[in-house]
Amino acid sequence: MASLIYRQLLTNSYSVELSDEINTIGSEKTQNVTINPGPFAQTNYAPVVLESWEVNDSTTIEPVLDGPYQPTSFKPPSDYWILLNPTDQQVVLEGTNKTDIWIALLLVEPNVTNQSRQYTLFGETKQITVENNTNKWKFFEMFRKNVSAEFQHKRTLTSDTKLAGFLKHYNSVWTFHGETPHATTDYSSTSNLSEVETVIHVEFYIIPRSQESKCVEYINTGLPPMQNTRNIVPVALSSRSVTYQRAQVNEDIIISKTSLWKEMQCNRDIIIRFKFNNSIVKLGGLGYKWSEISFKAANYQYNYLRDGEQVTAHTTCSVNGVNNFSYNGGSLPTDFSVSRYEVIKENSYVYVDYWDDSQAFRNMVYVRSLAANLNSVKCSGGNYNFQLPVGAWPVMSGGAVSLHFAGVTLSTQFTDFVSLNSLRFRFSLTVEEPPFSILRTRVSGLYGLPAFNPNSGHEYYEIAGRFSLISLVPSNDDYQTPIMNSVTVRQDLERQLGDLREEFNSLSQEIAMTQLIDLALLPLDMFSMFSGIKSTIDAAKSMATKVMKKFKRSGLATSISELTGSLSNAASSISRSSSIRSNISSISVWTDVSEQIAGSSDSVSNISTQMSAISRRLRLREITTQTEGMNFDDISAAVLKTKIDRSTHISPDTLPDIMTESSKKFIPKRAYRVLKDDEVMEADVDGKFFAYKVDTFEEVPFDVDKFVDLVTDSPVISAIIDFKTLKNLNDNYGITRSQALDLIRSDPRVLRDFINQNNPIIKNRIEQLILQCRL
């Protein structure tokens, strides 16, 4: 039955309105555009998969260790350490503002007895007593407050690295003192810091004060090995060419301007608030099993003050590179299990797309020099109770990660009404204490943040920082860049599909199994699938064409086309015969596929992997084989038909996507069997395989080669009632050989009889198949 629908999708054509084609082109067309790099280049959206070689373009990063530079005289900028690297010079540095501060640094070699030496300081000859009875070098800091006073010995730095430092900050001059590796900083105050000039007699480096910890590290432990090679040649300070412009936190600076365009630099502080979202899906049955617990994208809107201006911001938080965990407490229906739950760890990334209504986000299309600096934040997991029908509840608790800023690019953020050009901030992760565990299970001591309760009661997580960018905008501020309408239309459709998927998944428990079996036996075709939609015949024809076009681009349709070749007579009604028959046109191609599988069996050592690969190909054989029983696609189509009839969100726009998606995702865990005399061989897509006798259900050794030969020559049967269910049914109720053969062949009459008798084992199996019909 379902194969008839799929054949119609592959072969039939229907009339369609031209307006439908135009809408499709407008919403789905993509084109390759080559941008000529010049003064202005359009930035790309952020990548979905991150690679180790990824770098941020047009981002200027201030070096931690800038140099070395040749000896010179200059007025050093404030908030930059001058790291002095002498060789054997006696006078290292002289600095003064000629009003209230004169500082000189003298270098004394190891093992020097008390003696008087002559130095030339600020053009004057001075006799200064020095002594160094250690094996390290000593820096003597000489100081005076007025031009007529004598120099006094103020501080000493004893160093085995032979490095010293000098800094102008706030209203003081800072230097190092003490003994390495525990040297610290100290200061001398002045009323005129800006006029302090220096004469540096040695090679030196420049380090920003924001990296002061690095400067302290170099003073105490030495320069990196690379800086100590003979290939490092000092250059003149003029090569640095630094413009010391102290930008405000929030300001717009016009970089350049022509008659039509101008470059605008935007500097903004920023407060990012975000939260995680998750999806918790529970399996059917007795209520002891969960299907999946995963992260979902989460939107958050909020207001905050920026320099007295009220800003409305919108963020979208998503994750990449999740780790899949699972827990299985046993095979019984009352054993607690979670098939899959997601955890983010060190190999994961968190994306936060940020947009606000300020001027900075207008016309954000052509952007360069995009940079940001953000704080880190710790995200901790809370508790989640697995509410079991009976017994003590397992409790998931703990887990934490820290988010560290790792880059920023442009992105597009979709809201309910418009798509917005926004900034995507990327965060790398480190795991933190405490680890997570599941109480009353053996899961404990694992690190990362699981998707169970990632917000832990917090309304949001908050990160503060700032960003800057240079944007090409029209000279006339009244112009704005339009948003592509087709992008918004397509996003609206995606949102409708999301609502429809949630509704479809929630309808699974409302389907009566007896009606499902009856519906699965009906000769459904394309038009009968549309009965739940109130529309005209013309609309139905147009909709059928849309479904057909979607399906032809799917992976399943491509596989079927390759397998079956021409199916020109597929639109005609195919009646079921009393015996199993195969589509002749598929035999030769399937034989080729089987030979490929058999040929690969020697190279693949894992039998389970072989069975999984073979079972996934068996679905193609299932679609091209008609039997007197049911197959998985009969159930899939019946469930789809029932949900379409009950749905309130279905429409001609969403049905094509839903039908195509259901053909791929409904009942992903399929099992197939072949029957030879009194022996049944069964395999599923997870790689599990069985061989057993029909009379006793006693397992026998599984012969892979025999199985490959059988699937080439014999019909493939959908294992609606799998081996585990058959054995359970026989052990608890006892079944005859005739009943066993009927269940093995998935005879719908026998299935209906068992369901009408309210047999719990058969009912539970059919319920599980219905619950697997998820999008």
From Swiss-Prot:
Q: List the disulfide bonds.
A: C317-C379
What is the superkingdom listed in this entry's lineage? Viruses
Q: Which residues cross the membrane?
A: none
Region annotation Spike head: residue ranges?
65-223
Q: Return the annotated region ranges for Spike foot.
A: 509-775
Query: From the record, which residues define motif DGE motif?
Result: 307-309
Q: Where is this site: Cleavage?
A: R230, N231, R240, S241, R246, A247
As annotated in the record, motif KID motif runs over 643-645
Motif YGL motif, residue numbers:
447-449
Which Gene Ontology biological process is one annotated for this entry?
A: permeabilization of host organelle membrane involved in viral entry into host cell
Q: Which UniProt keywords apply?
A: Capsid protein, Coiled coil, Disulfide bond, Hemagglutinin, Host cell membrane, Host cytoplasm, Host cytoskeleton, Host endoplasmic reticulum, Host membrane, Host-virus interaction, Membrane, Outer capsid protein, Viral attachment to host cell, Viral penetration into host cytoplasm, Viral penetration via permeabilization of host membrane, Virion, Virus entry into host cell
**Annotated stretches, region: Spike body and stalk (antigen domain):** 247-478
* CC per GO annotation: host cell endoplasmic reticulum-Golgi intermediate compartment; host cell plasma membrane; host cell rough endoplasmic reticulum; host cytoskeleton; membrane; viral outer capsid
Coiled coil feature spans: 483-515
List the residue ranges of the region (Hydrophobic).
388-408
Q: Which InterPro entries match?
A: ConA-like_dom_sf (IPR013320), Rota_A_VP4 (IPR042546), Rota_VP4_MID (IPR035330), Rota_VP4_MID_sf (IPR038017), VP4_concanavalin-like (IPR000416), VP4_helical (IPR035329)
- Report the family membership: Belongs to the rotavirus VP4 family.
Q: What else is known?
A: This strain probably does not use sialic acid to attach to the host cell.
Its name, as the record gives it, is Outer capsid protein VP4
Tell me the organism. Rotavirus A (strain RVA/Human/Venezuela/M37/1982/G1P2A[6]) (RV-A)
Lineage at the top is: Viruses, Riboviria, Orthornavirae, Duplornaviricota, Resentoviricetes
